[in-house]
Amino acid sequence: MTSTQNHPLQTQDDQQRFGQSPESVRETDHYQQEYIEDFTDRWDRLIDWNARAEAEGDFFIRLLKEHGARSVLDVATGTGFHSIRLLEEGFDVVSADGSPNMLARAFRNARNRDQLLRTSQADWRFLNRDIHGEFDAVICLGNSFTHLFKERDRRKALAEYYAVLKHNGILILDHRNYDRLLEGGSAVRQGKGNVYCGKDVEVGPEHVDEGLARFRYSFSDGGVYHLNMFPLRYGYVRRLMSEVGFQQITSFGDYQRDFENPDFYVHVAEKEYRFDVDTTMH
């Protein structure tokens, strides 16, 4: 008799509903099945809040303050790392996510830090249906935008972000350096990188092609999970932002303005139209 406990990969893949051909699962809506409760319960071990805070420093806080932002919509709240940090810094934050399991974990994390999250489960493609009001900034962090597999979905989500911003608002969006992965390179140059900093989990790609980056998350307690994501290229994301209507777009690599082959990109897209600005700025 075979015990399912001896085959955590099979069991957890089944729970995430990847089926017999996981590499063929390339659907935007599937992320809801991927973030099962067991996985979200381990997510903070993947991040390691203290290590990530040290890696980021005050990068996002400084960016928001430089642009005069006070009200922030976090559209990819996850377990609440950025929402809670911003609340602690005095920002007015609304926290949204498409995964109810993630939002539940974020709410508990905030409560444990004497903060109260205002949460909303929302689909980015219909953001204005669920989120009301305008914001100084929208943040979409944690490599979250890669859950959108169709270009139509990506354009619609960006348009929804644009619509909830005030006339001079900004969008801050990050993603992995998928260009390097698609060209045969590694996910991180060395160590754990500066986003997923947990020491008891191994993260790496199992399959990469132009339409899919399938990552494996192996925890020290035997838990193994996967995420299927769309590999966003650097230039493509910038072009898409511009075509949706954002004006000046400034990009960073691993939180630095001057970069070469970083692990992660961060794009800051400004909504405000100014006559004297070169919108081709990199």
UniProtKB/Swiss-Prot annotation:
Catalytic activity of the protein: glycine + 2 S-adenosyl-L-methionine = N,N-dimethylglycine + 2 S-adenosyl-L-homocysteine + 2 H(+); glycine + S-adenosyl-L-methionine = sarcosine + S-adenosyl-L-homocysteine + H(+); sarcosine + S-adenosyl-L-methionine = N,N-dimethylglycine + S-adenosyl-L-homocysteine + H(+)
Record flagged with keyword Transferase: yes
Pathway(s) annotated for this protein in UniProt: Amine and polyamine biosynthesis; betaine biosynthesis via glycine pathway; betaine from glycine: step 1/3; Amine and polyamine biosynthesis; betaine biosynthesis via glycine pathway; betaine from glycine: step 2/3
GO terms assigned for molecular function: glycine binding; glycine N-methyltransferase activity; identical protein binding; S-adenosyl-L-methionine binding; sarcosine N-methyltransferase activity
SUPFAM superfamilies, per database record: S-adenosyl-L-methionine-dependent methyltransferases
Xref: PANTHER family: GLYCINE N-METHYLTRANSFERASE
Binding site for substrate: 143, 176, 217
Pfam families hit by this protein: Methyltransf_25
EC annotation from Swiss-Prot or TrEMBL: 2.1.1.156
UniProt function note: Catalyzes the methylation of glycine and sarcosine to sarcosine and dimethylglycine, respectively, with S-adenosylmethionine (AdoMet) acting as the methyl donor. It has strict specificity for glycine and sarcosine as the methyl group acceptors.
Chain positions recorded as S-adenosyl-L-methionine binding sites: 35, 43, 52, 76, 97, 123-124, 141
Family in the record: Belongs to the class I-like SAM-binding methyltransferase superfamily. Glycine N-methyltransferase family.
Gene Ontology CC entries for this record: cytosol
Biological-process GO terms, alphabetical: glycine betaine biosynthetic process from glycine; methylation; one-carbon metabolic process; protein homotetramerization; regulation of gluconeogenesis; S-adenosylhomocysteine metabolic process; S-adenosylmethionine metabolic process; sarcosine metabolic process
pH-linked activity: Optimum pH is around 8.2 and 8.0 for glycine and sarcosine, respectively.
EC top class, as a word: transferase
Keywords on record: Methyltransferase, S-adenosyl-L-methionine, Transferase
Assembly behavior: Monomer.
Region spans: Disordered: 1-27
Positions with biased composition (Polar residues): 1-23
Name of this protein: Glycine/sarcosine N-methyltransferase
